[in-house]
């Protein structure tokens, strides 16, 4: 009898432990997205606009009222140079930039933002939902972005921009690999009607163990001042050099 009582007690204890472990596992699983989000936030906050010098090549194709123009600009960013915010226009359509092009580029320098992984810190400081894509990657979805996160044609469109951020892993370290932005149809400055804007930014893990931006592709269609148009832009980033 004593053996039976002891056996029953042990069985009950095991069952209770199994239930407890199940609840612990569920709690850990439920907490993983928040832990992952915090890790990526910390990762982005550890980086800054002055971490790297790099080259950016911009290939653009713009069509307005049936006329298409294609251009290729190459520019260089070096945070160790204070002039013009560190930006230098290297070439325009394969040739050295003209004086007018340099003057126009210099005038726009104060508006020119430094792209990079550090900018994602703003995203992860706001509310998001989580899902898993067809590649079994975790995807964070943001219905809108914090103020000053998305600038289009010198206008802040953050509140009308949704974002999907796909998380990959490199040598056991998670990082955001793809960032897809979609802007709702809207009017910009009462002049431009934006019908569609989508972009995707791709990152990879750099040799220093820090994520770096390698490509940004955007597509936009809209109309304004009696003209309809569209634009396709591909920006590639290369020649990264650590500055600090």
Regions found by a protein language model. Give the residues of each.
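Bacterial N-terminal signal peptides that target proteins for export
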Residues: 2-16
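Short, flexible helical or helix-coil boundary motifs
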Residues: 13, 17-20, 47
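N-terminal signal peptide c-region/cleavage motif recognized by signal peptidases
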Residues: 24-25
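Structured extracytoplasmic
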Residues: 29-161, 173-176, 182-194, 220-244
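Exposed regions on extracellular, virion, or secretory-pathway luminal proteins
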Residues: 46, 171, 207-210
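Extended lipid/amphipathic-ligand handling interfaces
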Residues: 162-169, 198-207
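Cysteine/selenocysteine-centered motifs that mediate thiol-based redox chemistry or coordinate metal-sulfur cofactors
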Residues: 203-230
